[in-house]
C-alpha cells in the first residue's frame, strides 16, 4: 500500500457474501425443486454447468459455450444428453454478442438453457445448489461475484486465473502460505505458483495482452483457451458427487475463515478502515502548491507495472540467427 508520513493511505475492504443467504441446500428443499422444474421441466440432468454473469466480450461467454460443446463431444451421446449449460445472462447485447446464434452455430446438439430475467438472492442460492459447478473465464475481472457466491454455497468453480478471480481460489506459494502480491508481482497469471484450493479448477491464461480505454488506460487481458476450459469441465464431471461435495464445502469453510470473502469480515474491515482513517486523519492545508512533477497520475511507483519482466535469452536468439544465416 502507498505510504505518507509512515501511514498507509489505502485499506482493502474485500467483497463479502452473506453466508446466511448463500449456503448449501438440500436437493429436497422446496425452492430447489421449484427452480429445477422451471429450468428443466421433468428432465433430470447428471451434470449442470452454471454461468451467471453479463454478456460482454471480456466474460468470454462464447468460449464457455464452445468449451461445453468440446466437453460433450468427448462423452457418449447418452452421457451428453444428461449434461446442460445454464446461462443466466442477456441473450443479445451490443457489448457482447448474439448468444443464441452462437449456440446454434457452435453447440447445436447439446442442451443450453438461457435465463434472462432477474431472480432473488434466495432463488440464486437455489441455482448454485442445482449446479454441479459454476464457471467464469473472463479475460479481465475485478472480482467475479458469481464465483464468490458459488463458493459460499459449497459449489465448486472453474475460473481463469486473472484479476480478482485468482483471489478466490486459495492460491499458496511453494511454502504453503497465501500468495503475497506487491508492486513487482501483482498477478499469478503466469502460473508462478500452481497450488490452489480443492474447490477450484483454475485455468492459466495462454495469451496475456494489454487492453485499455480512456478511463482505464491499461489493464492486463488474460485469455485462456476453450480447449483447456473443456478439460476443466471434464475434471468436475469425472469426480464423484461425494468428492465434489467435499471440495465445495471446503471452499465454503475457506470463505468463512481465512479467505475472508464473507459479509461479516467485510463489515469488520470497513469498521477498521474507518477507525484508522479517523485516528490518523491529516487535515488539508488551506491551499497547496503543486508542480507537474507532483502529479503522479497513472504512473506506477518505482517504475513497477505489477508483473515480472522476463529476461530475454539472447544466446538462444543468436543461435537461431546463425541457423538462418547458414541457409543463405
Give short role names for the model-derived ranges:
Residues 23-42:
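A short helix/loop element that forms part of the nucleotide-sugar donor recognition site in Leloir-type
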Residues 91, 96-122, 175:
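Nucleotide-activated donor-binding/catalytic signature segment of Leloir-type glycosyltransferases, i.e.
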Residues 139:
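Aromatic "clamp/platform" in nucleotide-sugar-dependent glycosyltransferases that forms part
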Residues 29-35, 109-131, 163:
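Conserved active-site histidine-acidic residue motif and adjacent donor-binding/catalytic loop
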Residues 16:
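Carbohydrate-associated surface elements
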Residues 41-59, 65-68, 85:
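Conserved donor-binding/catalytic core segment of Leloir-type glycosyltransferases
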Residues 156-159, 169-170, 176-186:
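Short hydrophobic beta-strand element within catalytic cores of glycosyltransferases
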Residues 200-328:
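C-terminal amphipathic helix plus adjacent low-complexity
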Amino acid at each position: 500500500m502507498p505510504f505518507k508520513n509512515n501511514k498507509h493511505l489505502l485499506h482493502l475492504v474485500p467483497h463479502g457474501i452473506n453466508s446466511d443467504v448463500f449456503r448449501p441446500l438440500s436437493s429436497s428443499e422446496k425452492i430447489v425443486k421449484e427452480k429445477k422444474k422451471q429450468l428443466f421441466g421433468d428432465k433430470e440432468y447428471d451434470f449442470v454447468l452454471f454461468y451467471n454473469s453479463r454478456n460482454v466480450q471480456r466474460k468470454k461467454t462464447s468460449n464457455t459455450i464452445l468449451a461445453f460443446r468440446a466437453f460433450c463431444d468427448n462423452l457418449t451421446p447418452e452421457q451428453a444428453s444428461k449434461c446442460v449449460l445454464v446461462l443466466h445472462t442477456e441473450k443479445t447485447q451490443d457489448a457482447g454478442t448474439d448468444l443464441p446464434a452462437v449456440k446454434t452455430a457452435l453447440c447445436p446438439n447439446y442442451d443450453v438453457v438461457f435465463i434472462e430475467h432477474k431472480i432473488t438472492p434466495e432463488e440464486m442460492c437455489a441455482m448454485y445448489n442445482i449446479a454441479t459447478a459454476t464457471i467464469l473465464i473472463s479475460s479481465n475481472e475485478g472480482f467475479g461475484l458469481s464465483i464468490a457466491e458459488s463458493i459460499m454455497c459449497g459449489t465448486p468453480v472453474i475460473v481463469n486465473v486473472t484479476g480478482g478471480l485468482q483471489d478466490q481460489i486459495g492460491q499458496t506459494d511453494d511454502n504453503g502460505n497465501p500468495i503475497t502480491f506487491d508492486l513487482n508481482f501483482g498477478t499469478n497469471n503466469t502460473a508462478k505458483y500452481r497450488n490452489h484450493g480443492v474447490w477450484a479448477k483454475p485455468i492459466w491464461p495462454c495469451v496475456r495482452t494489454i487492453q485499455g480505454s480512456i478511463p482505464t488506460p491499461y489493464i492486463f487481458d488474460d485469455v485462456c483457451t476453450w480447449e483447456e476450459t473443456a478439460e476443466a469441465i471434464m475434471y468436475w464431471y469425472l469426480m464423484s458427487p461425494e468428492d465434489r461435495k467435499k471440495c465445495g464445502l471446503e471452499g465454503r469453510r475457506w470463505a468463512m475463515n481465512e479467505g475472508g470473502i464473507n459479509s461479516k469480515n467485510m463489515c469488520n474491515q470497513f469498521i477498521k478502515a474507518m477507525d484508522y482513517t479517523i485516528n490518523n486523519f491529516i487535515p488539508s492545508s488551506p491551499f497547496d502548491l503543486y508542480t507537474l512533477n507532483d502529479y503522479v497520475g497513472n504512473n506506477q511507483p518505482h517504475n513497477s507495472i505489477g508483473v515480472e519482466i522476463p529476461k530475454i535469452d539472447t544466446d538462444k536468439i543468436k543461435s537461431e540467427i546463425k541457423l538462418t544465416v547458414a541457409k543463405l
